[in-house]
Amino acid sequence: MPICDPSSSSTGAGSTKLWIIHGVAVVAAAALALGAHYYMFYRRSGEFRSRVVGIIPARFASSRFEGKPLVNILGKPMIQRTWERAKMATSLDHIVVATDDEKIADCCRGFGADVVMTSDLCRNGTERCNEALSKLDKRYDVVVNIQGDEPLIEPEIIDGIVKALQAAPDAVFSTAVTSLKPEDARDPNRVKCVVDNHGYAIYFSRGLIPFNKSGNVNPQFPYLLHLGIQSYDTKFLNIYPELPPTPLQLEEDLEQLKVLENGYKMKIVPMQVIKVEHEAHGVEVPEDVDKIENYMRERNLH
């Protein structure tokens, strides 16, 4: 129904109704303009998405590597090494470990970390971050999901994805990629990513993407490896658990595909991807522990 009907009378109840509707439209427009003014003010003043918490989700019952957060890496539990690296990031106002396991909680409290106990019903790290966020006393604008199996995570990567999200008001999710090593091309535990010309994620896969018709790895192509860290706008994080699981997410067992497949990238809020130069050293399976310890010894990292 149009706001202004040419056949409407200019007097009486019809006129009153017309002016009320017109008044509502004017007030709504003014509210939008005022909101935009404050939005731009916060962007310029550096207060947009300014309160940031880092959450390290950790569970004991991993199907591929049970007890992984507590595995010893050169004298320290892996979860402690991840926490110590995260503490070096300048963008985080607070860091907590989110877990459903008392052994992990006791270990983390022992080296000084704040711990939030979460349900054992969380289906992935993102849902665990959301539950932990709801239990924190302070309110935050951005949550950084720091994977507990990245004991050598670079603080610059954490700061980089936070800045990417702060600089992209149309995005609700940011993550990072790096160059894929040829030897990791066929490894399903190394998640690959393809990105559009504007720096937004197109797809993630455990298989090699893109895949050429020869079936061989092209040594000239810049394949990308997804790093196990991501940040979310907290408003989006609150609705993430309510998004229905998707076929691609379930087939690949990759939670970020639920965001893309539910249409956020294409229609409303794309997933921002930043590329960083980083030699990834995540621990997915027990065999990775020796690799990372050798890497640390070679570079005198303790």
Language-model features: where?
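Terminal signal-anchor or tail-anchor transmembrane helices
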Residues: 4-44
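N-terminal glycine-rich phosphate-binding loop and ensuing alpha1 helix
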Residues: 45-98
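Hydrophobic/aromatic residues located in beta-strands of well-ordered beta-sheets
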Residues: 54, 95-97, 143, 174, ...
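Short, high-confidence coil segments that cap the C-terminus of an alpha-helix
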Residues: 92, 138-140, 168-171, 264
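Short phosphate-binding loop-to-helix
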Residues: 96, 102-163
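Conserved alpha/beta core of the MobA/IspD/sugar-nucleotide pyrophosphorylase nucleotidyltransferase superfamily
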Residues: 138, 218-302
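Conserved core of the sugar-phosphate nucleotidyltransferase
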Residues: 153-246
